[in-house]
Amino acid sequence: MAPIGRYSDGPHVRWRVSIQGTCSHVIAADQRPDAFLWVCMMDIAVDQGFLRQRLPSRDVSATRALDRYDPAYDPLLSPTPGCGRDYAPTYWIDTAGEPPVDDGPIDSDREVDVAIIGSGFTGLSAAIALARDHGIRATVLEANRVSWGCSVRNGGQAQCASGRLTRSQWIARWGLDTALALHAECLDGMEYFKRLIADIDCDVQPGGHLYVAHRAARMPMLEREAKVLREVFNYDAQILDADTLRRHYIDDHEAAGAMHEPEGLGVHPAKLAFGYLEKARALGATVHPASPVQGWVTKDGWHHLQTPGGVVRARAVGVATGGYTSQTLHPRLRNRLMPILSNSVVTRRLTPEEIEANGLRTHQVITDTRVLRHYYRLTPDGRLQIGSRSAITGRGAPDKRYERMLLDGMVRKFPGLRDVSIDYSWWGWVDVSHDMMPRIVQPDPHVAIYYALGYGGNGVMYAAQAGRRLAQWIAGAGGSLNLPIFQGQLPFPNVAGVITSEWFAPFRRLGQRALYRWYHLKDEVL
């Protein structure tokens, strides 16, 4: 028997232990090791007696606590993201310091008012808002370690956006009035985000967002969008020509110019997530890692959430699982998302001479105009972080060719970094909706289930606002939320945006492969 994790339990200290390396258990420090509750899905014997208890099992392998992270995990194939898996080996986790204390795994049956599934930016933001604004102390359930998913695997770019559509596309889809209201929602979200993180030490890098034209052919689009932003939305977006961009911002060798947006921040995602965790617990929320929801039954107005350590009975459930939403979590979520893999690398620390030679003159967050976009920035400690598309499937994610593709993109932008070593490389799943916009909704007004999903890679900032809106819904104050992102449900897959049907779901990845080829042609050739 060996201790593999420690957490607080009020005045007590508890240890998570492994026996024969097969499953995880929770015991109090003063408890006899032959009389503890086995928190695993198998036959058990208690206190040297012959009491045998059979617990329902869905995924025995998912009950191993603090297992190494699974690089080939795939949300379309795996019933859960695991149980107690360690973090991906990202730059953010390596430089965030020790994670704050949490509340340990669920270790008994319990009744709660509100359960939140997922402890990333959205889930923790919802727990904060529920406690602070509505007096509700949520119970947050996390399959692995706190904020284990893309909340600690992203690029740390807090942009004034929600979903993947431009403001011009909002106008085309919903009309001017709705587009203006959506813009106001994003601005309000950015201000809320700034207030929320004001006392969190998360390496904030202000300065706005640079949207770089990676080819001259993309400059007219940026010029049109900047004009719409200024004249229609009263948002001070400015066009930078290639010379101005290189002299004052960044010497990206692909860049033909850029659009500068006034709102945009760089943050350290793991430090931000850990700050949210501390805020949520300080307000009375409880956050339980290694507690995946392995079964969900609704009966007589109660939601019975089966975890390895016990059943959580909740009056209301908020889902904030992002790109790690399994197909089997709940029928209302099945086939509603398209999980997309994104790769990221971080170089070794660059010398001041290397930074100068490569024209890295700003710490602003940057994306380019590719459909399969690159996102990049200089970190506070002088490294280049850059990310872009990855494999189609989890099984393909560890293939080094995707890292090489990303490094080729980096070298096209900054040839002087060709021989610079890479200290960190990882990938994560992004929750993309089938219409490129998120939903923060109660899909059935008669059932207390709510979700906030589908940010499409723009969740660093908006997840804070989405968590607040999710809390409004859960607290019964969501009636005033009347924008399209607060109504209906996430749509099923579609063909060319015309025909929508769940029948297309089995062919999503075939379509993704075809789209990636088409997007490559649009980005690099046409």
How should these model regions be labeled?
Residues 114-139:
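N-terminal Rossmann-like FAD-binding beta1-loop-alpha1 element of flavoenzymes
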Residues 259-302, 306-308:
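Helical element adjacent to the flavin cofactor pocket in flavoenzyme catalytic cores
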Residues 44, 394-396, 404, 408-514, ...:
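C-terminal catalytic lobe of FAD-dependent flavoproteins
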Residues 156, 199-206, 310-312, 316-353, ...:
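Active-site substrate-recognition segment that forms the wall
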Residues 170-279:
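Rossmann-like flavin
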Residues 133-153:
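Glycine-rich FAD pyrophosphate-binding loop
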Residues 156-175:
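N-terminal glycine-rich dinucleotide-binding loop that anchors FAD/FMN and/or NAD(P) in oxidoreductases
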Residues 17, 21-23, 35-112:
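Extreme N-terminal leader/targeting segments of oxidoreductases
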